[in-house]
């Protein structure tokens, strides 16, 4: 099969960056990324009138809500009620517009999901197919046990050589452990389970 003669340093850096981005996407979550892309699309890129109206009405709701919080319902009841009715009307209109643009959101979400998959998987498969026989690193003979040198060289190289398969395995392991160490202090503490007390048997 065809292989490409690419500089090993380029392969090392490229594969590391792609795997790092994969881990970052996993940490953030595809759904959050889709939400961010949708927000950018609706705010800056879309030419849909429904989306423009949706954004305007959302802004109106935000402004009216601020006004309502500054008014006392007891002291200025009429004004407060008027704003409240306007808010109810706007929320109903926003709900209707949201149903209208739901199809477009589904389309953008699908495109975003496909783009993420292609960006993160195609380069890796390209490297695996066309650079699989490129030696990336060399280990001085005898520095490791012979069986370990042989294992690290799998599946295409002689002992003492590190290829893409081994490099990607190591990078994935290091990144996973690094993410765990960074995120562990911020994880929610699990309460220690309380052992139930055995009910004392009452003498009959």
UniProtKB/Swiss-Prot annotation:
Membrane topology: Multi-pass membrane protein
Record's subcellular location: Endoplasmic reticulum membrane; Golgi apparatus membrane
Topological region Lumenal: 1-11, 138-161
Main location: endoplasmic reticulum
Subunit field text: Component of the Golgi to ER traffic (GET) complex, which is composed of GET1, GET2 and GET3. Within the complex, GET1 and GET2 form a heterotetramer which is stabilized by phosphatidylinositol binding and which binds to the GET3 homodimer.
Keyword terms, alphabetized: Coiled coil, Endoplasmic reticulum, ER-Golgi transport, Golgi apparatus, Membrane, Transmembrane, Transmembrane helix, Transport
Main function: Required for the post-translational delivery of tail-anchored (TA) proteins to the endoplasmic reticulum. Together with GET2, acts as a membrane receptor for soluble GET3, which recognizes and selectively binds the transmembrane domain of TA proteins in the cytosol. The GET complex cooperates with the HDEL receptor ERD2 to mediate the ATP-dependent retrieval of resident ER proteins that contain a C-terminal H-D-E-L retention signal from the Golgi to the ER.
Protein name: Golgi to ER traffic protein 1
Family note: Belongs to the WRB/GET1 family.
């Amino acid at each position: 099969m065809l292989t490409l003669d690419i500089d090993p340093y380029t392969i090392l850096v490229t594969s590391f960056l792609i795997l790092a981005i994969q881990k970052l996407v996993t940490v953030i979550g595809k759904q959050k990324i889709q939400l961010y892309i949708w927000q950018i699309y609706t705010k800056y890129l879309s030419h849909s009138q429904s989306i423009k109206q949706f954004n305007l009405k959302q802004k109106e709701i935000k402004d009216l809500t601020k006004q309502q919080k500054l008014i006392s319902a007891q002291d200025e009841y009429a004004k407060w009620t008027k704003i409240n009715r306007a808010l109810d009307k706007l929320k109903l209109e926003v709900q209707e517009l949201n149903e209208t643009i739901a199809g477009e959101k589904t389309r953008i979400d699908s495109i975003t999901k496909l783009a993420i998959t292609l960006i993160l998987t195609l380069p890796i498969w390209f490297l695996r197919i066309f650079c699989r026989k490129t030696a990336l690193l060399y280990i001085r003979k005898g520095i490791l046990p012979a069986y370990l040198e042989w294992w690290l060289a799998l599946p295409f190289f002689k002992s003492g050589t590190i290829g893409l398969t081994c490099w990607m395995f190591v990078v994935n392991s290091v990144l996973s452990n690094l993410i765990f160490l960074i995120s562990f202090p911020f994880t929610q503490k699990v309460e220690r389970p309380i052992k139930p007390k055995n009910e004392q048997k009452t003498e009959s």
